[in-house]
C-alpha cells in the first residue's frame, strides 16, 4: 500500500513519527463489510510519501509503470517544481537532480477552501454547500477569485522566489488548477504542465509509482 500525506505531515518536524504511525496502523490484516459481504485484506508493506510526490510521479511515469528516457533526463538532471492546489492546502515541492530541495518545501492552508470563505463573508452557507455549488458551476466567484489568485501567487513568490527561474517544468495539480489556469500560464508560460485530470493526478501518480517500484506482481 502506498499512502500520500499532506506535505506538512510527511516532511514536517514530526514527519518520521507520523510516517511510522501510519505504517503501524495500516499494515497487517484489515476486514470490513460492504454490500452485506465481508471483505478481508492482508497488507504486507506500507510506503508513505507526500501528495506532491504523487503528482510528480504522475508526470514522470507512464501508465505501464515505466519512466521514459526523456523523463529520466528531467528527473535526474533538471530542476522542477510541483504545486498542488487542493481544497484545504496549497503544497509546494522542488526537486533538483533527483533530490528534494527541503528549503523550498511548503504547505499553506490557503487552498480552494479559502476561495469559498471569501465568497461567504456572512457564513450563510456551509463549506459543503459552497463546494457543491462550485463543482456544479453555480457559485459566483467573480469578486473573490482575483483576491484568491493574488494570494496563491503571493505564496509562490514567498516560498519559491527566484528558484522559479531554474525550473524546467512546473507541475500543477488539484482542483484549484482549473480556477487560475490563465494566471499560472501567464507566470510559467511553456514550462507549465497541467495534467489531463489535475484532480486525480496525485492518486494516479501513486498508482504509477507503485507499478514503477514493485511491478505488476
Regions found by a protein language model. Give the residues of each.
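A mobile "lid/hinge" subdomain adjacent to the ATP/sugar-phosphate binding pocket shared
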Residues: 112-148
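Conserved catalytic-loop position in the HRD/HxD motif
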Residues: 82-86
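Nucleotide/phosphate-binding catalytic cleft detector across ATP-hydrolyzing
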Residues: 1-80, 102-112, 139-169, 175-217
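Short acidic-glycine loop/turn motifs at beta-strand connectors
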Residues: 96-98
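Short beta-strand scaffold segments in enzyme catalytic cores
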Residues: 90-94
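Short, glycine/acidic-enriched loop or turn micro-motifs at the edges of active sites
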Residues: 54, 87-88
